[in-house]
Curated annotation (Swiss-Prot):
The keyword Protein biosynthesis applies. This is Ribosome-recycling factor. Responsible for the release of ribosomes from messenger RNA at the termination of protein biosynthesis. May increase the efficiency of translation by recycling ribosomes from one round of translation to another. The gene is frr. It comes from Xylella fastidiosa (strain Temecula1 / ATCC 700964). Coiled coil: none annotated. One of its GO terms (molecular function) is ribosomal large subunit binding. Its main location: cytoplasm. Gene3D superfamilies: 3.30.1360.40, Ribosome-recycling factor. It is found in: Cytoplasm. The lineage of its organism: Bacteria, Pseudomonadati, Pseudomonadota, Gammaproteobacteria, Lysobacterales.
Length: 185
């Protein structure tokens, strides 16, 4: 039972870190990346559809993205969705091709994005600490119901703390890496 609590905590911490990585992938750096457009949804076929399901996205020349829309009737919808997103990009439409040129980030915008990255990292750390708290509470509940001894509680809490420290270190590395990527001109 104790091992199951540890495994559950580790799985939840890993999912939190993965969610942070996915979230940071959509933060715009100076380089073009198809993941930049992951959050864009298009009204297609009666529902909100992710852009990557109605078009292919590729990188061209490092600082531009080329979107090839599968259905040429959807080009206008894709263009509107890009304008509506908060990415600040201006699409150039030529038939089923949409080109997005990414202007270099200003120093001010880089600093703003660094703050956003740092904030998301802190939110993830809070989530990890909450997972630790939940796991420790489950361990204490097991002690109350006399399923485990005091020594097992102490060892269990130490193991959970080690998992937490490892996860927080991983979050710090992810955030630092993204901040370096942002500050590289």
């Amino acid at each position: 039972m104790l091992n199951q609590i540890k495994q559950d905590a580790q799985d939840r911490m890993t999912k939190s870190i993965d969610a942070l990585r996915n979230s940071l992938a959509s933060v715009r750096t100076g380089r073009a990346s198809p993941s930049l457009l992951d959050g864009i949804k298009i009204k297609a076929y009666g529902t909100d559809t992710p852009l990557n399901q109605v078009a292919s996205i590729s990188v061209s020349e490092g600082r531009s993205l080329v979107i090839t829309v599968f259905d040429k009737n959807m080009s206008k919808d894709v263009e509107k969705a890009i304008y509506a997103s908060d990415l600040g990009l201006t699409p150039t439409v030529v038939g089923t091709l949409i080109r997005l040129n990414l202007p270099p980030l200003t120093e001010e915008r880089r600093k703003e994005l660094t703050k956003v990255v740092h904030s998301e990292g802190e939110d993830t750390k809070v989530a990890i600490r909450n997972i630790r708290r939940d796991a420790n509470q489950q361990i204490k509940d097991m002690l109350k119901s006399k399923e485990i001894t005091e020594d097992e509680v102490r060892h269990g809490e130490e193991d959970i703390q080690k998992l937490t420290d490892k996860a927080i270190k991983s979050v710090d590395e992810v955030v630092k890496s993204k901040e370096q990527e942002l500050m590289t001109v």
